[in-house]
Amino acid sequence: MLILAGLGLYDENDMTLKTLKFAKKAEKIYAEFYTAVLTGTTTEKIEEVLGKKIHVLSRKDVEYNGYKLIEEAKDKDIMFLTAGDPMVATTHVDLAIEAKKKGIEVLIINAPSIYSAVGITGLQLYKFGKTTSIVFPEENYFPETPYNVIKENLERGLHTLCLLDIRIDENEKRFMTANEGLKVLLELENRKKEGIINEDTKAVVVARAGSLKPKLVYGKIKDLINYDFGEPLHCIIIPGKLHFMEEDALKYLCENI
């Protein structure tokens, strides 16, 4: 059996009792921390809670050698752990599909993810439109997708969740800050010039969602862009049309600057 289980958002205390139960039954436990990462803990602390060794896989291991993991699950209980919810990343969905194709039983254990955690802002989840990702710009690479998604969502009165780039491999460990993400959005406006985003556009920044002390800050981009949000992970929300209760939530649940 292949067990796909989420670890939640922040530390080793976020995993469910169900994950703990099946981890104790699993013959081998794998994990990946390149699509998302728990910044409030370490692999060693998670191993201590589970009472078992975790074999951490790289992006290359999962994307090119994932079939080996599936082969093991033919006659063993194999657990694959991820930060957040296990079915958010398409790579994990692909593992589940391929296992099913081979007649292998698949158990999915859901967990808190950023998609549910943004509810701490008080913004109504059903009013979020398409999610987008803001990545680190590179030479000859400056994706316009975030700008286009925000534009489409705003036209429909919907909020936009902007996930920020994570770079984790053997040579690099880098998390995009909300400040960097906001600068990218302003640069996209400078290039596109469609009047969608400017320094007076209001945004919400969520830092360390899932922790006991998350940071929620609401204000204009010009005020947020130099604010110190502290340790990662960060995300940005561009609100759409606000219900009066959402306005109250942003006023009382977030720090207003």
Swiss-Prot record:
Pathway: Protein modification; peptidyl-diphthamide biosynthesis. It comes from the Archaea. CDD domains: DHP5_DphB (cd11647). It catalyses: 2-[(3S)-amino-3-carboxypropyl]-L-histidyl-[translation elongation factor 2] + 3 S-adenosyl-L-methionine = diphthine-[translation elongation factor 2] + 3 S-adenosyl-L-homocysteine + 3 H(+). GO terms for molecular function: diphthine synthase activity. Keywords: Methyltransferase, S-adenosyl-L-methionine, Transferase. S-adenosyl-L-methionine binds at residues 9, 85, 88, 113-114, 164, 209, 234. Its EC number is 2.1.1.98. One of its GO terms (biological process) is methylation. Pfam families: TP_methylase. Homodimer. NCBIfam families: dph5. Belongs to the diphthine synthase family. S-adenosyl-L-methionine-dependent methyltransferase that catalyzes the trimethylation of the amino group of the modified target histidine residue in translation elongation factor 2 (EF-2), to form an intermediate called diphthine. The three successive methylation reactions represent the second step of diphthamide biosynthesis. This is Diphthine synthase. It comes from Methanocaldococcus jannaschii (strain ATCC 43067 / DSM 2661 / JAL-1 / JCM 10045 / NBRC 100440) (Methanococcus jannaschii). The gene is dphB.
